[in-house]
Amino acid sequence: MKLHILAVGHKMPDWIATGFDEYAKRMPPELRIELREIKPEQRSSGRPAESVMAAERIRIEAALPKNARIVALDERGKDWTTMQLAGALPSWQQDGRDVAFLIGGADGLDPDLKARADMLLRVSSLTLPHAMVRVLLAEQLYRAWTITQNHPYHRV
C-alpha cells in the first residue's frame, strides 16, 4: 500500500522539502509516502473562490490513484488522535487500496471533492500554512506506523 499526499501548491521552501523527505524516507517499503504537487489555479481579483477550487479539483482528480481510499484534509473533518490514525493503518493495509490524502489550495478543497472522499480528516484546529501540513502529515503517518510496530519513537 502506498500513502499518496496530493497537495495543491508548488515551489515550497527548502526546509519544507527537507522536513517532508526526512519522514518519508523513514517509512518502510510497504508504506511508502509519495508526494504529488498539484499546480494551483491562477487567482485574480473578481474570480470567485468556487471557480478556483473547481479548477483545482479537476487537477486533483486527474492525479488520484485508481481505487484509492480518499482522505480529504478539512477543518470540519474528524478530529483524530495519533492513536486513532495508528489504529486505522493496519485496517487500511488489509484493505489493500492505496490511501490518498488531499491538501487543498488557499481556498480549500472543492465541495464535490470533499463529498467524494471516504473521510474528512482535521489535522489541527489551528490554521496552518499548506506547506507545513505536508511535513506535519508525513510526521504523523510515520509516528502512527511506529506505534503499530512498538517502536520507541512515540512515547506516551
From Swiss-Prot:
Keyword Chloroplast applies: no
Database matches in InterPro entries: Alpha/beta_knot_MTases, RlmH-like, tRNA_m1G_MTases_N
Broad EC category: transferase
UniProt superkingdom: Bacteria
A single MF term (Gene Ontology): rRNA (pseudouridine-N3-)-methyltransferase activity
Enzyme nomenclature, EC number: 2.1.1.177
GO cellular component terms given for this protein: cytoplasm
Binding site for S-adenosyl-L-methionine: L73, G104, V123, S124, S125, L126, T127, L128
Alphabetical UniProt keywords: Cytoplasm, Methyltransferase, rRNA processing, S-adenosyl-L-methionine, Transferase
Transmembrane segments: none
UniProt function note: Specifically methylates the pseudouridine at position 1915 (m3Psi1915) in 23S rRNA.
Complexes and interactors: Homodimer.
Protein name from the UniProt record: Ribosomal RNA large subunit methyltransferase H
Organism of provenance: Paraburkholderia xenovorans (strain LB400)
Gene that specifies this protein: rlmH
